[in-house]
Structures are given as C-alpha cells and as structure tokens.
Amino acid sequence: EIRLSLVGSEMCIRDRYCQTLDLRDSPELIAEYRKRHSQAEAWPEILAGIREVGILEMEIYILGTRLFMIVETPVDFDWDTAMTRLNTLPRQQEWEEYMSIFQQAAPGMSSAEKWKPMERMFHLYNT
C-alpha cells in the first residue's frame, strides 16, 4: 500500500506492509515477549539493523496471542532484499532464535519466514 505521510515539514510517499504472527498461548511467555519489546529491553543492535535496512517506522499490536505489525518504508524499498540483509546483521539471528521461544514458529526461521503478509481487503480514503 502506498500512502502519503507528513514527516517533519515534508510530505513523503511511503509503502506500508502489514503482517501477522501468533505467539504461544502462555500468559508468562506473552508477558516476557512484551517486556523484551519494551524501549528499555529491546536490543540496540536489532533496532539499528531495522533502521539500517531502510525501515522508517514499525509498530506491533497484540490481541491475545495474535500479533499485527505495520512497517512503513520508502517506496523504492525491496522487502526480500532488505530481509535477506537484515538476517546477516549483528545479533539478528540470535534475536530470532530467542524470539522463537515465544512465537508459534520453528527455531531457525528468519523474521521474514515467521511473519506472514496480510492482504488488505478494505480501505476508505478521504477524497
């Protein structure tokens, strides 16, 4: 999805990616997963890597065990290339392996393999 955003005082055209992933059905694991994604606990190398591959903004929402992630990128962003590169950056594989404890995903899977793209089925824009 391409959208226009105001960044500072400039208008920017961006792509938006929406993805989903399920967590294991364990209140303790979910609480720990939330903690690990807090500003105080997130690994700096992971945040730096996300920015380094060109991701402008990322948000993750949760409902029960279901995660919903919104990623905004420049319009010339190539998802597959960026995710391949991200997987080679410092501590990324270690982070993914650690996160697999909480996620309904097999150990050794990359972020791109775990998070499933969602299809937009409705939109309403102001005209």
Question: Which residues are covered by each model-predicted region?
Answer:
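Short glycine-/aliphatic-rich beta-strand segments at the starts of folded cytosolic domains
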Residues: 14-32
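Short, well-ordered beta-strand segments in beta-rich or mixed alpha/beta enzyme
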Residues: 17-22, 56-89
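Short, conserved, surface-exposed binding loops centered on an aromatic residue
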Residues: 10, 52, 59-61
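An amphipathic, aromatic/His-enriched active-site/gating alpha helix that lines ligand/cofactor pockets
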Residues: 53, 74-114
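Single conserved hydrophobic/aromatic residue that forms the stacking wall/gate
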Residues: 1-8, 13
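Eukaryote-biased recognition of C-terminal alpha-helical segments
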Residues: 114-122
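Short amphipathic alpha-helical segments
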Residues: 29-54
